Design a protein with these regions (language model features):
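Polytopic transmembrane helical bundles with strong interfacial aromatic enrichment
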Residues: 1-144
Length: 144
């Protein structure tokens, strides 16, 4: 049986990849306007990434309650939790805004840059979150 402490590491990698690739598809879509399929693919990847991020955040929140830390490890854990929450909020707001725009058929207006900016912000937050999570594992051997 898989230990409970492994659920978070198992669940974080897919949303990271999905959200990052969705953002990259959107960047290329902005540069190559003749390829609407890139934006559509980015849209669906972003939705899947958001759902995965919710699961990853939930498993991390659960794991945080089962792991005892102190000192610098506790500080890094707090920063990791903060950036994970900021990542989740940014990707949820970006995805909901994008879904609304698709259903209102306003995704080809200037307003498309709002979810795009939030997606960029979420990718930046995810990068910091991943760095801090790696620091917890490598420097403090948390989760091993």
């Amino acid at each position: 049986m898989i230990p409970v402490s492994h659920f978070h590491p198992l669940s974080v990698h897919f949303p990271i990849a999905l959200i990052t690739v969705a953002f990259l598809f959107d960047v290329v879509s902005l540069l190559c306007k003749k390829e609407p399929c890139l934006s559509t693919a980015g849209y669906y990847l972003q939705i899947l990434g958001m759902l995965g991020a919710i699961a990853a955040w939930g498993t991390g929140h659960f794991l945080a309650g089962t792991t005892q830390m102190e000192g610098e490890a506790m500080q890094v854990k707090g920063q990791h939790e903060l950036f994970a929450t900021l990542s989740l909020i940014a990707i949820i707001v970006a995805t909901v805004a994008r879904i609304i725009m698709v259903y209102q058929k306003t995704e080809n207006t200037f307003y498309k840059y709002i979810p795009f900016g939030l997606s960029l912000l979420s990718v930046l937050f995810i990068t910091v979150t991943g760095y801090l999570g790696g620091k917890l594992v490598i420097d403090f051997m948390i989760g091993l």
